[in-house]
Amino acid sequence: MAVKNIVAVDLGASSGRVMLATFHTATQHLTLKEIHRFSNTLVFQDNHHQWDLVALERDILTGLQQIDAMGIAPDSIGVDSWGVDYVLLDKNGQRVGLPYSYRDHRTDGVMAAVTAELGREAIYQHTGIQFLPFNTLYQLKALCDAPPDDLDKVEHLLMIPDYFHYRLTGNLVCEYTNASTTQLLNLEKKTWDGELLDYLGVPRRWLSDPVQPGHAVGNWTAPSGRQIPVTAVATHDTASAVVGAPLQSRDSAYLSSGTWSLMGIESDTPFNSPQALAANITNEGGVDDTYRVLKNIMGLWLLQRVCQERDIKDLGTLIQSATTLPAFVSLINPNDDRFINPPSMHQAIRDYCREHGQPVPQSDAELARCIFDSLALLYRQVVLELGELRHAPIRQLHIVGGGSQNAFLNQLCADVCQIPVLAGPVEASTLGNIGCQLMALGAVTDLAAFRHMLTHNFPLHRYTPRAESDFAGHWRRFQALSQPETAPQGKKETTQ
């Protein structure tokens, strides 16, 4: 019986993992084994928030070397990560400059200046990408407007997963789904937008033409001497998460729930109408020539920060305490600028509630309840916006990722959105990464077959909406808070 061993390196904005999948082609049985899990934390150095790429590479190699020591020769390796962030290389392939994080404040005010100069409508018609102040477009504008002394040494720009593929193989490849997050890819041509690059002053030699998921990057030489193929998967973690979401129909929306919440639909065509622009909808690249028509939501970053600041270790107890409190007492707009990276998240939430004349949450449980209620209401808003764009209602929501383990938030989402919710699998990004590799190897015929296989290997949990008698008033309150929408400052992830 043919067996495929696949390695997925899944890098998130707060953690990473090296996972080994074993797929039996005859029985369609897929198992996952976690080889190495590690943290990914921002480093504040030289007055900027940066990624510790050296530590990430060390952890990636630790996982791969452990697999090699087990005597396993994987059929393929693939890396996915968050979007928008990049690495600059010189002609010798050495890093140039700092590996900035999207949460760094160097882009503050840049998006406003660029859109004032070029016009939101023109940028959106070119790219179809939502306006987020940390998009690569604005990161590069900040870089080129205040160029470091060594900028003239730059020969190549790689997105984060492309950089690690390069470190494994020595080959420079730019993958499409992550490239689409930059707001520099032409929506129609699916290649770099020359006008935007010229505006920034970015030489075109920095950027190679994007390749589609499934592209063979090269080989990694393992300590044993084995040559292991490396495949460009859907390298944006959300793109992989969508592959790993067993959507049941085109009337289903997905919600990749983690540090960021990313909600959207799969579409054969992009949506870049004035209505889509007004809703700040993005059209990121997907697999099989699809578009991920979606919206970024601040997500569980809010809760993660509160737990960190308040030294909360027992998340289960916190959630249980929140369930006992009255609903919708204090509400925030999770996508308000102030929540991207405040000095104190719990204080930012309290200040917001105070400024809007609401009860100020004091206890940890009250803060959590405020976050959960507000996220569910924002999910409802995006579900309605997506339905209006496609001229057909969303009939089911599929939640994947780490946040899909939060049964309370899942049920709250079903209740507020008034549609059934399916939750799982948890490791959707990892599974989507694996799916891209299996399809590239011909072990799975297509995306539909892969998703069908997932439903037989990973249990899904269904949440049926319940009626809320006094919901209309809470919904009006939230709409007042969220209009006009303020886009989140500063990802990312999730992510984005």
From Swiss-Prot:
Its EC number is 2.7.1.5. It catalyses: L-rhamnulose + ATP = L-rhamnulose 1-phosphate + ADP + H(+). ATP binds at residues 13-17, 259, 304, 402. The gene is rhaB. This is Rhamnulokinase. It comes from Pectobacterium atrosepticum (strain SCRI 1043 / ATCC BAA-672). Keywords: ATP-binding, Disulfide bond, Kinase, Magnesium, Nucleotide-binding, Rhamnose metabolism, Transferase. Disulfide bonds join 353-370, 413-417. The keyword RNA-binding does not apply. Pathway: Carbohydrate degradation; L-rhamnose degradation; glycerone phosphate from L-rhamnose: step 2/3. The keyword Nucleotide-binding applies. It is an enzyme of class 2 (transferase). Belongs to the rhamnulokinase family. Substrate binds at residues 83, 236-238, 296. GO terms for biological process: glycerol metabolic process; rhamnose catabolic process. The active site is at 237 (proton acceptor). Its cofactor is Mg(2+). Coiled coil: none annotated. InterPro entries: ATPase_NBD, Carb_kinase_FGGY, FGGY_C, FGGY_N, Rhamnulokinase. One of its GO terms (molecular function) is ATP binding. Involved in the catabolism of L-rhamnose (6-deoxy-L-mannose). Catalyzes the transfer of the gamma-phosphate group from ATP to the 1-hydroxyl group of L-rhamnulose to yield L-rhamnulose 1-phosphate. GO terms for cellular component: cytosol.
